[in-house]
């Protein structure tokens, strides 16, 4: 096969990896896929308790919202917030 034909074939196939089956661009970050699926299902905000895997840590609150993606805060009573230029984090009382 001539080199030009191989180059054209590669250029044709290469962009296909950037799109999923629905024709939408695939997110590049590791948390984007789950968040994108949740948003496509109706954008339900879901908060449930979870255990943080650090020593002497109390219960935390898992947060899956449009704003926070999927994360856990260090203790009860915390809420997920977005800090401008710092990304997602927790806002805890006290």
UniProtKB/Swiss-Prot annotation:
Disulfide bonds join 63-72, 68-80, 73-90, 78-92. Residues 1-25 form the signal peptide. Residues 26-44 form a propeptide. One of its GO terms (cellular component) is host cell postsynaptic membrane. It comes from the Eukaryota. It is found in: Secreted. One of its GO terms (molecular function) is toxin activity. The modification 4-carboxyglutamate is found at residues 47, 49. Expressed by the venom duct. Keywords: Acetylcholine receptor inhibiting toxin, Disulfide bond, Gamma-carboxyglutamic acid, Ion channel impairing toxin, Neurotoxin, Postsynaptic neurotoxin, Secreted, Signal, Toxin. Its main location: secreted. The cysteine framework is XX (C-CC-C-CC-C-C-C-C). Displays a mini-granulin fold, a structure composed of two short, stacked beta-hairpins connected by two parallel disulfide bonds. This newly described fold is derived from the same cysteine connectivity as knottins (ICK fold). The name 'mini-granulin fold' comes from the structural homology with the N-terminal region of the human granulin. Belongs to the conotoxin D superfamily. Alpha-conotoxins act on postsynaptic membranes, they bind to the nicotinic acetylcholine receptors (nAChR) and thus inhibit them. Through its two C-terminal domains, this homodimeric protein would bind to two nAChR allosteric sites, located outside the nAChR C-loop of the principal binding face and at the adjacent binding interface in a clockwise direction. This toxin specifically blocks mammalian neuronal nAChR of the alpha-7/CHRNA7, alpha-3-beta-2/CHRNA3-CHRNB2 and alpha-4-beta-2/CHRNA4-CHRNB2 subtypes. Hetero-, homo- or pseudo-homodimer (identical sequence, different post-translational modifications). This is Alpha-conotoxin-like Vt20.1.
